[in-house]
Amino acid sequence: REYLLTGTVVGGEHIGRTIGFPTANIRPDDSSKLIPANGVYAVDVWSQAGDINRERAMLNIGTRPTFNGTATTIEVHIPHFAGNLYGSTLSIAFLRKIREERKFDSPEALVEQLNKDLNNIEQ
């Protein structure tokens, strides 16, 4: 059975956009809902408003250590979507964990890994 998380898209630091992987930052609707462990996940995502039908996506839960982050964030990259989702409600179905979150030596090394992760979510 899929683990589902529903949340609202909120503003972030736009780091993903600057490295070619724009993300929607998710604030869970239910603050008491258990959040999966930090890491990178293959997920399906869709919007309550219907502007995104069920799409395969890549989600990170963690602190973004490559960029010296400290707060835990939930960020989803939807490969085939280019639009504004701020304020939208997204539903996320966790399919499988791809890897642990880790600190990369450079943003370029992170991008190289993200491209591998992207290939992995399609399988």
Where do the PLM segments sit?
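Charge-rich, low-complexity N-terminal segments
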Residues: 4-5, 10
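Short coil-to-beta-strand transition motifs
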Residues: 1-3, 53-54
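Phosphate/ribose-recognition catalytic cores of enzymes acting on nucleotide-derived substrates
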Residues: 11-123
